[in-house]
Amino acid sequence: MPIKLNASFSDSYVDVSQYRDQHFKGNRYEQEKLLKQSNTLYVGNLSFYTTEEQVYELFSKSGDVKRIIIGLDKVKKTACGFCFVEYYTRADAENAMRFVNGTRLDDRIIRTDWDAGFKEGRQYGRGKSGGQVRDEYRQDYDPARGGYGKVVARP
């Protein structure tokens, strides 16, 4: 029988961060309202090799997962280090924000944030080369995220 983590105060929502999706179609107030009602989490800093099954195994400990959308490089169609996790209820998503954010998955410290809701096309990285923007400018070598940054000149 799977273990389910429950927060003792799951009726209150976890604070919304200052990050806002620049591609959101609507104003800041509308986005804030959606974030405070959302059942969807953005998960970042994943290894390029982390599988949907690994994400499910971790996030299902906080509640019933409706679906997982793995972020893809828009050119290569390979994983590029992020995903969206959608729960059936806000309370289960709040549990994940409390208990999963900052934990280790596939030898990486992952971060979670509220997402206004997945829409088709958002599964693709927004970087110029097809992946995530932050990976294009990384100066260190990170084999789990594709090696060196693609834009930064190597010594």
Swiss-Prot record:
<keyword id="KW-0963">Cytoplasm</keyword>
<keyword id="KW-0509">mRNA transport</keyword>
<feature type="domain" description="RRM">
    <location>
        <begin position="39"/>
        <end position="117"/>
    </location>
</feature>
<keyword id="KW-0810">Translation regulation</keyword>
<feature type="binding site">
    <location>
        <position position="19"/>
    </location>
    <ligand>
        <name>mRNA</name>
    </ligand>
</feature>
<dbReference type="GO" id="GO:0031047">
    <property type="term" value="P:regulatory ncRNA-mediated gene silencing"/>
</dbReference>
<comment type="function">
    <text>Component of the cap-binding complex (CBC), which binds co-transcriptionally to the 5' cap of pre-mRNAs and is involved in various processes such as pre-mRNA splicing, translation regulation, nonsense-mediated mRNA decay, RNA-mediated gene silencing (RNAi) by microRNAs (miRNAs) and mRNA export. The CBC complex is involved in mRNA export from the nucleus, leading to the recruitment of the mRNA export machinery to the 5' end of mRNA and to mRNA export in a 5' to 3' direction through the nuclear pore.</text>
</comment>
<keyword id="KW-0539">Nucleus</keyword>
<dbReference type="InterPro" id="IPR000504">
    <property type="entry name" value="RRM_dom"/>
</dbReference>
<dbReference type="GO" id="GO:0005634">
    <property type="term" value="C:nucleus"/>
</dbReference>
<keyword id="KW-0943">RNA-mediated gene silencing</keyword>
<dbReference type="InterPro" id="IPR012677">
    <property type="entry name" value="Nucleotide-bd_a/b_plait_sf"/>
</dbReference>
<feature type="binding site">
    <location>
        <begin position="122"/>
        <end position="126"/>
    </location>
    <ligand>
        <name>mRNA</name>
    </ligand>
</feature>
<dbReference type="GO" id="GO:0017069">
    <property type="term" value="F:snRNA binding"/>
</dbReference>
<protein>
    <recommendedName>
        <fullName>Nuclear cap-binding protein subunit 2</fullName>
    </recommendedName>
</protein>
<dbReference type="GO" id="GO:0005846">
    <property type="term" value="C:nuclear cap binding complex"/>
</dbReference>
<dbReference type="Pfam" id="PF00076">
    <property type="entry name" value="RRM_1"/>
</dbReference>
<dbReference type="InterPro" id="IPR027157">
    <property type="entry name" value="NCBP2"/>
</dbReference>
<feature type="compositionally biased region" description="Basic and acidic residues">
    <location>
        <begin position="133"/>
        <end position="143"/>
    </location>
</feature>
<comment type="similarity">
    <text>Belongs to the RRM NCBP2 family.</text>
</comment>
<dbReference type="GO" id="GO:0005737">
    <property type="term" value="C:cytoplasm"/>
</dbReference>
<keyword id="KW-0508">mRNA splicing</keyword>
<feature type="binding site">
    <location>
        <begin position="111"/>
        <end position="115"/>
    </location>
    <ligand>
        <name>mRNA</name>
    </ligand>
</feature>
<feature type="binding site">
    <location>
        <position position="42"/>
    </location>
    <ligand>
        <name>mRNA</name>
    </ligand>
</feature>
<keyword id="KW-0866">Nonsense-mediated mRNA decay</keyword>
<dbReference type="GO" id="GO:0045292">
    <property type="term" value="P:mRNA cis splicing, via spliceosome"/>
</dbReference>
<dbReference type="GO" id="GO:0000340">
    <property type="term" value="F:RNA 7-methylguanosine cap binding"/>
</dbReference>
<keyword id="KW-0813">Transport</keyword>
<dbReference type="GO" id="GO:0006408">
    <property type="term" value="P:snRNA export from nucleus"/>
</dbReference>
<dbReference type="InterPro" id="IPR034148">
    <property type="entry name" value="NCBP2_RRM"/>
</dbReference>
<dbReference type="GO" id="GO:0046833">
    <property type="term" value="P:positive regulation of RNA export from nucleus"/>
</dbReference>
<feature type="binding site">
    <location>
        <begin position="132"/>
        <end position="133"/>
    </location>
    <ligand>
        <name>mRNA</name>
    </ligand>
</feature>
<dbReference type="GO" id="GO:0008380">
    <property type="term" value="P:RNA splicing"/>
</dbReference>
<dbReference type="GO" id="GO:0000184">
    <property type="term" value="P:nuclear-transcribed mRNA catabolic process, nonsense-mediated decay"/>
</dbReference>
<dbReference type="GO" id="GO:0003729">
    <property type="term" value="F:mRNA binding"/>
</dbReference>
<dbReference type="GO" id="GO:0006417">
    <property type="term" value="P:regulation of translation"/>
</dbReference>
<feature type="region of interest" description="Disordered">
    <location>
        <begin position="122"/>
        <end position="155"/>
    </location>
</feature>
<keyword id="KW-0694">RNA-binding</keyword>
<comment type="subunit">
    <text>Component of the nuclear cap-binding complex (CBC), a heterodimer composed of ncbp1/cbp80 and ncbp2/cbp20 that interacts with m7GpppG-capped RNA.</text>
</comment>
<dbReference type="InterPro" id="IPR035979">
    <property type="entry name" value="RBD_domain_sf"/>
</dbReference>
<dbReference type="GO" id="GO:0051028">
    <property type="term" value="P:mRNA transport"/>
</dbReference>
<keyword id="KW-0507">mRNA processing</keyword>
